[in-house]
Structure formats: C-alpha cells, structure tokens
C-alpha cells in the first residue's frame, strides 16, 4: 500500500482585456498589501489566512529592486500598456501533502528556478489551510530580462522566405539590384510575436518538468521513510509515497476516469454540513475507478487459465458489480 500523491497543474494568463491587474493578483496570492501606481488603488489581502510561504526568484541580470513585489508588478504594468496586454502567467500546482513545509518549499524553489533560467521572473506563494490541499501559486512575467536588466520585446524579426525556403532580397527600384547598406546585403524581414511561452508544446514541457522534479522529491522522501522504518516496529512504519504522472490516464494506458479539481470552496461547504456536487462527483468517479481496477485484476488473474475457469471468472465479476451497486445505493440513502 502506498500513499497516493496527486498531480494537478493548471496554467492561466492574466490580461488587461479581462479587467485584471498584476498588482491585485500578486497581492491576493501573497496575502500582502500592494499599491497600484497606475490606478492609484490599494489591494489589501493581509487578513487572508493560509499563506504558508512567499518568495520572489529573479534572474541574475534582473534589477535587484524587483525583489520587492510592489515594485516588480508595477513595473510589469508599466511596460504592458496595450488594452489587451497579457500581464502575467499563473501556475496553480498541487503539492504532495506527505511532504513537510520545508520539503515543499525546496520543491517549489527548484521548479521556480527552472522557470527563471528561461528568463522570466517568478513570484510564488504556498497556500495551506491544513485542509489536506496544500498548493502553490506561481506568477511569472510574460517578458524576459535582457543582459542590461531591461524588459525584452515580445516580438522578434525573422527573414522572409520564398517558396524554396530562400531569403528574399530587398530590390532597389532605381537599379533593379539588391540593396546594400554599410557593405551588407539587405533582405526582407517580418516581425512576429514571440509566443513560444504560450505554446501547447511549452505547457506540456512544463507539466512534465514539474512531474520529474516532484518525483525526485518523492524519491528523496521515500528514502528517508525507508530508513526510518528500519528503526521501528511493523505497526509504527510509514507508508511510501507514489509517483505522480503528468500524462492523462488514456496516455498512460490506465483504465480510469480522471477526477475533477475540487477546490477549497467545495471542501468548506462539506465542513459546514452542505453537499458539494464536485466532491460527490469525485466520489462517484473514485467508486467506478475502484470497480474497473478490481475487474482488471480479475481479468489478469484468469487470463492464464483455460475456459474451464470462465464460470468462476463470471461469478467474481458479478460479485464485484453487486457490491458496487450496494455501495452506491447506500450512499443515496
């Protein structure tokens, strides 16, 4: 038996077109009070509970004052001026509750540093209300920082190519020849938005990276658990933690239905004695997954036998289904 670590990584982008601000987003996630210099407003979330840890990671070439959250996100809003500008990206990630806060911080720092190595700034806050749902919010800038500590452009220029994949020369209308400037031949170029950080491929790479980094932390924790278990009796031993997997069940070849994200509001409803449809849906999904798991086990068990055992197989399958129906009906009463 192993403790099941949960994989959840969700990305979204905050933008002006949605009426959002980077200052408000950062203040809420860090549980701080920040002044918005552009709107002349204050976002105060100092009474927000459950902020376990908060920190900003900067590239080595970034201005040191960006370690101040208010300075950083006001600078972002100053450079992202267009009415539909993307202000920041948020990673919302579930943390293994089996890890201590110190271990969770080390895990998040490792992932944040990997993002910073790509040029962005990362502002992250760990939330934990002791409700079994520790998670981290990581806000990252949409632009990188250049060698001079300035914001990089979101655009890039590339050479225009003809159908054969060759660069297209700029022709001087007077001479009919290719233009030359400062001894260099001139070629047609076009400006493109640099959307590499917004690509589906990049998101998949980040999802896998988190899975890999998290599993390394889990392996480290399991090694400690194994060492501690050697020093205690059987009844005091701890369970190891399972790996997480960024792939869907279908991609893993697993016959399971994925659960939906519950969120703190759903769990709060149940603590107050109300019914949460999201939690009920996950219970139904988990029940069906349990049935499929049992049926898969039976299938593997009887696969090596001949047809004489088919009736035994059918009886066990029927038993599993009947137990499942009884459990479901019991929950409805």
Tell me the role of every PLM-derived stretch.
Residues 1-333:
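N-terminal nicking endonuclease/strand-transfer module with a His-rich metal-binding environment
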């Amino acid at each position: 038996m192993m403790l099941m670590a949960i994989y959840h990584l969700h990305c979204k982008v905050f933008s002006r077109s949605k009426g959002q601000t980077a200052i408000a987003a950062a203040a809420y996630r860090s549980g701080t009070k920040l002044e918005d210099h552009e709107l002349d407003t204050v976002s105060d979330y100092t009474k927000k509970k459950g902020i376990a840890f908060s920190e900003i990671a900067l590239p080595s070439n970034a201005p040191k004052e960006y370690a101040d959250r208010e300075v950083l996100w006001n600078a972002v809003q100053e450079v992202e001026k267009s009415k539909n500008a993307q202000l920041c990206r948020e990673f919302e990630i579930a943390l293994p509750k089996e890890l201590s806060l110190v271990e969770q911080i080390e895990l998040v720092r490792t992932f944040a540093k990997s993002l910073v190595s790509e040029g962005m700034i990362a502002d992250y806050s760990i939330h934990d209300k002791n409700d079994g749902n520790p998670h981290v919010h990581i806000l990252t800038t949409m632009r990188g920082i250049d060698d001079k500590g300035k914001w990089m452009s979101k655009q890039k220029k590339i050479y225009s190519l003809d159908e054969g994949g060759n660069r297209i020369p700029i022709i001087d209308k007077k001479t009919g020849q290719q233009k030359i400037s400062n001894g260099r031949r001139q070629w047609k170029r076009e400006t493109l938005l640099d959307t590499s950080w917004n690509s589906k491929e990049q998101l998949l790479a980040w999802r896998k990276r988190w899975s890999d980094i998290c599993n390394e932390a889990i392996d480290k924790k399991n090694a400690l658990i194994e060492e501690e278990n050697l020093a205690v009796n059987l009844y005091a031993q701890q369970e190891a933690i399972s790996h997480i997997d960024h792939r869907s069940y279908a991609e893993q070849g697993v016959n399971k239905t994925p659960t939906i994200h519950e969120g703190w509001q759903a769990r709060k409803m149940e603590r107050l004695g109300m019914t949460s449809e999201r939690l009920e849906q996950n219970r139904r999904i988990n029940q069906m997954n349990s049935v499929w798991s049992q049926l898969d086990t039976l299938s593997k068990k009887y696969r090596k036998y001949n047809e004489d055992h088919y009736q035994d197989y059918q009886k066990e399958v029927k038993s599993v289904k009947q137990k499942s129906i009884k459990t479901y009906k019991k929950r409805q009463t």
